[in-house]
């Protein structure tokens, strides 16, 4: 099943949100309208701001005073969409006599933003999770009473986010400053996954506007490990990545007596116990297993400790095991002679899970790294990457793509696997740090440069690699793993021209592929 990825687009003749702001939001008769409220759909003259604020304050007092004792709905006057805030507030103050009972936690469901959604669309209220006004419960199918319809907070939130990002791209920082404050207020009132992801995007925009960037030296590697462990436990994305890569490795070494794996990102080594146990059960006895783990120099002691723990496991399950830890600041600094490969006597595998996209931050580095991989002549290369295009030149395009992508990720955390709230929060922080890097930084500091499977296919092909079909068995077993891990109905495994993808609802989020040297290079 091959997915057709379709980007959200805006007709060329349609003015941008920032242009609407700068032109008074569209038109004659709206002169002197407050531009920051206008982008959110409210028509308020600058001269009326004080009067509107007073009316809204009075309305809030009336609602607060009446909520404890009222049980009826509004009278028979219809209150229309409150785009005219002044008239709406006055009408409410005049006609509001009673206040319906309300469960303050009442919310409706919010779909994740998908590629087919127009971010500014106002269609279909049924699937948006928004915290509704106190009058919400007065709406029934048979009721003839008047109701008040509040504009969807979620739609306004996305509009404000995109408008702010566009203002940033146009370097209109005064407008961006005002909009990012509005985004923060809207995000605070938005329930569920959308409110959470918007809060991280608002912080990232604010950091970009005010040029407040976290120092790379200030990031504690041990804290990063904790976040990644929680992400691994909380959702199936890393489990899927490790499982599909391991399955490809097992199929490539069925008759090998010596297996050597070079892991370009050892991290906590969570991938390798499962592979070692599978090798131990291989018919005819396990092969000798060599693991070369690459990590950051700041974690040199942790790498050696991990090697010791894996050696203990290997001894317990009867697998001959050797470990070699390598440290480097940049993967592009690796050289072929560092790996001590033995081409004649071993099957060599190079493994990369979410490690290639950061290399794109340095021009020419990915080409050098892939040339090094090619030089060691691996029998197999496994690659798992995020299925997203976050490495384009245009900031607004990257922002829109990231908003869609992380909305789906946050939604899967909210509605997918049932997990403790603390683990979910840590996973959200893990993803939030990616959002901050993607939106707030530029140049070599921006390492979250995710690319799609189609883009990686071009890069791997240019570097001299041919694709390896992961096969129907890997598809079936990955689907089974997903079911056994309690992944929820929203997750699904998709096959894409021999590669596998893990999707939430209809949006692929993770892509796993396997590669071998082109035929002319395998001699």
From Swiss-Prot:
Transmembrane segments: none annotated. Residues 440-516 are annotated as: SAW. Residues 228-293 are annotated as: VHIID. It is found in: Nucleus. A motif (VHIID) lies at residues 259-263. Expressed at very low level. Mainly expressed in germinating seeds and flowers and siliques. Not expressed in other tissues. Pfam families: DELLA, GRAS. Residues 148-516 form the GRAS domain. Residues 155-209 are annotated as: Leucine repeat I (LRI). GO terms for molecular function: DNA-binding transcription factor activity. Residues 305-337 are annotated as: Leucine repeat II (LRII). Interacts directly with the GID2/SLY1 component of the SCF(GID2) complex, suggesting that it may be ubiquitinated. Interacts (via N-terminus) with GID1A, GID1B and GID1B (via N-terminus). Interacts with the BOI proteins BOI, BRG1, BRG2 and BRG3. Probable transcriptional regulator that acts as a repressor of the gibberellin (GA) signaling pathway. No effect of the BOI proteins on its stability. Probably acts by participating in large multiprotein complexes that repress transcription of GA-inducible genes. Its activity may be regulated by phytohormones such as auxin and ethylene. This is DELLA protein RGL3. The gene is RGL3.
């Amino acid at each position: 099943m091959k997915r057709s990825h379709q980007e959200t687009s805006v007709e060329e003749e349609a003015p941008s949100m920032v242009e609407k702001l700068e032109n008074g939001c569209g038109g004659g008769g709206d002169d002197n309208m407050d531009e920051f409220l206008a982008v959110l759909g409210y028509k308020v003259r600058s001269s009326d701001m004080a009067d509107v604020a007073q009316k809204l304050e009075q309305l809030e007092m009336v609602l607060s005073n009446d909520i404890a004792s009222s049980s009826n709905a509004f009278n028979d006057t219809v209150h229309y969409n409150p785009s005219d805030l002044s008239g709406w507030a006055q009408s409410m103050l005049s006609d509001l006599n009673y206040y319906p009972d309300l469960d303050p936690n009442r919310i409706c469901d919010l779909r994740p933003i998908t590629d087919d959604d127009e971010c500014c669309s106002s269609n279909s209220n049924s699937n948006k999770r928004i915290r509704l006004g106190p009058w919400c419960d007065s709406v029934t199918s048979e009721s003839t009473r008047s109701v008040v319809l509040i504009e969807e907070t979620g739609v306004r939130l996305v509009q404000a986010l995109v408008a702010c990002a566009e203002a940033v791209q146009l370097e209109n920082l005064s407008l961006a400053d005002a909009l990012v404050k509005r985004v923060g207020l809207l995000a605070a009132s938005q329930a569920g996954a959308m409110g959470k992801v918007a809060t991280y995007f608002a912080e990232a925009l604010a950091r970009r506007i005010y040029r407040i960037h976290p120092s790379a030296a200030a990031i504690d590697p041990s804290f990063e490990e904790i976040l990644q462990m929680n992400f691994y436990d909380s959702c199936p994305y890393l489990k899927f990545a490790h499982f599909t890569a391991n399955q490809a490795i097992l199929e490539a070494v069925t008759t090998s007596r010596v297996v050597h794996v070079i892991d370009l990102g050892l991290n906590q080594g969570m991938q390798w116990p499962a592979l070692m146990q599978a090798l131990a059960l291989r018919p005819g006895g396990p092969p000798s297993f060599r693991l070369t783990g690459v990590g950051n120099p700041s974690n040199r002691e942790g790498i050696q400790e991990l090697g010791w723990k894996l050696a203990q496991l290997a001894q317990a399950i009867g697998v001959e095991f050797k470990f070699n830890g390598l440290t480097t600041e940049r993967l592009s600094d690796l050289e072929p002679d560092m790996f001590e490969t033995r081409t004649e006597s071993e099957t060599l595998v190079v493994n990369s899970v979410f490690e290639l996209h950061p290399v794109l931050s340095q021009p020419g580095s990915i080409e050098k790294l892939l040339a090094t991989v090619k030089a060691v002549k691996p029998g197999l290369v496994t690659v798992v990457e995020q299925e997203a295009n976050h490495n384009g030149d245009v900031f607004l395009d990257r922002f829109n793509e990231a908003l869609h992508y992380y909305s789906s990720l946050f939604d899967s955390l909210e509605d997918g696997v049932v997990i403790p709230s603390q683990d979910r929060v840590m996973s959200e922080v893990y993803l939030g740090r990616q959002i901050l890097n993607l939106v707030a930084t530029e140049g070599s500091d921006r390492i979250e440069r995710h690319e799609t499977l189609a883009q990686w296919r071009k890069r791997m092909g240019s570097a001299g690699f041919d694709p390896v079909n992961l096969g129907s068995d890997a598809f079936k077993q990955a689907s089974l793993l997903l079911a056994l891990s309690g992944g929820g109905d929203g997750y699904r495994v998709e096959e894409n021209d021999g590669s596998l993808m893990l999707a939430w609802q209809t949006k692929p989020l993770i892509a796993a592929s396997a590669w071998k040297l082109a035929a002319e290079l395998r001699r």
